[in-house]
Amino acid sequence: MNLATFWFILIAILWSGYFVLEGFDFGVGILLPFLGKDDGERRTMINTIGPVWDGNEVWLLTAGGATFAAFPAWYATLFSGFYLPLLIILAALIIRGVCFEFRSKVESPRWRANWDRALFLGSVLPALLWGVAFANIVRGVPINAAHVYTGNLLTLLNWYGLLGGLVTLALFTLHGAIFTALRTTGELSQRARRTAVRVALAAVPLAAVFLAVTQYSHGRPATDVTAAAAAVALIGATVAAIRGREGWAFTGTALTLVLAVATLFGNLWPNVMPSSTSAAFSLTVANASAAHYTLVVMSWVALVFTPVVLAYQGWTYWVFRKRLSGPAPEAPVAGPDVVEPVGGRP
């Protein structure tokens, strides 16, 4: 395995981590106006992700930075061609951060309701658009001989791209519902579990159709296995949610996301951005990678700092592992409403 291939695999792992961790953040934000019946419950839902949401976004920054450094041609074509959807995603992520900071600053139901709506919007847009973007990358986009994207926004809003967006939206919502059930107690936890079962009834057929179409059009024997495993994991998560086994259900949805990313990246190989204009114009791992020396330096940096980051993030999740119960008190500091877990059992 050469270094370019190593970094292609590592970028796939980074996206997997981002979708697993930020996926339940998006899901909680999407469900906030519907699952939380009053301000106390909505505050409790926000508190489940309060200590970790910003750390989860580090995976996105790392994936983007790794793409820029290891595959500069891929980064240039991707971010110039997809600039509008990526700009919308960036704006939505900024809105989410502002919501966490400002929601509890004013004692006004109207103020908080408006920020809850903004948090919903800032969660649903990335959840939808990430699926649209990755589906189009696998499908192939119009790229000319100079590796310049020649399409427009409507080019990306094809039926396959929109189906991919609906799949990620459904999976992240399901992931967030199960996470809420896992991290809370009482009626809120039970309501989240029931919601997860209902969302799964939409997520399972959507994911099945998307994976089937993907494998029929772009698949290969190895990714047939990962696609089938993703479907099994999703069905297993649904069964676990029905039986009230939130831990197993969360593991199932996490595995579904990891295996789905593995399927998409496996189908991409050896391309990183296929051209629908001509296969000769496609960006590949070989022609889009950085110089060998750059990849060597990056590999040593990753070897040193990746374990440190993983250890810190693992410690964060361990510290805030307890379930949250009841309306949480107001936060005395800036940031999400409460940054300390409140009572409850592990």
Regions found by a protein language model. Name each.
Residues 28-51, 68-74, 101-113, 174-194, ...:
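Juxtamembrane membrane-water interface segments of multi-pass membrane proteins
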Residues 52-123, 144, 221:
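Membrane-interface helix-loop-helix modules in multi-pass inner-membrane proteins
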Residues 156-171, 291-309:
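Hydrophobic alpha-helical transmembrane segments
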